[in-house]
Amino acid sequence: MAHKKAGGSSRNGRDSDGRRLGVKKFGNEAVIAGNIIVRQRGTRWHPGANVGMGRDHTLFALTAGRVQFAKKHGRAYVTVVPAQAAAE
């Protein structure tokens, strides 16, 4: 009888899912306290006024207002201009 030998198994064929990093709230976008502004690995963006940084370098709003991105001294900063100041 003719037999076909079993095929070998491949050792490839797996990959991890993307981590969904990046900017979540863009410039001049309204945020409320606790909103995530940027998810990042390391400090690509640094926290400015009214912005907190989590354990994994996630930047989040500490107050309600509008998001602003700025470069200062060769670093990129993210700040939140409070809603009262933005309205005036």
Swiss-Prot record:
<dbReference type="InterPro" id="IPR001684">
    <property type="entry name" value="Ribosomal_bL27"/>
</dbReference>
<feature type="region of interest" description="Disordered">
    <location>
        <begin position="1"/>
        <end position="21"/>
    </location>
</feature>
<comment type="similarity">
    <text>Belongs to the bacterial ribosomal protein bL27 family.</text>
</comment>
<dbReference type="GO" id="GO:0006412">
    <property type="term" value="P:translation"/>
</dbReference>
<dbReference type="GO" id="GO:0003735">
    <property type="term" value="F:structural constituent of ribosome"/>
</dbReference>
<dbReference type="InterPro" id="IPR018261">
    <property type="entry name" value="Ribosomal_bL27_CS"/>
</dbReference>
<keyword id="KW-0687">Ribonucleoprotein</keyword>
<dbReference type="Pfam" id="PF01016">
    <property type="entry name" value="Ribosomal_L27"/>
</dbReference>
<dbReference type="GO" id="GO:0022625">
    <property type="term" value="C:cytosolic large ribosomal subunit"/>
</dbReference>
<protein>
    <recommendedName>
        <fullName>Large ribosomal subunit protein bL27</fullName>
    </recommendedName>
</protein>
<keyword id="KW-0689">Ribosomal protein</keyword>
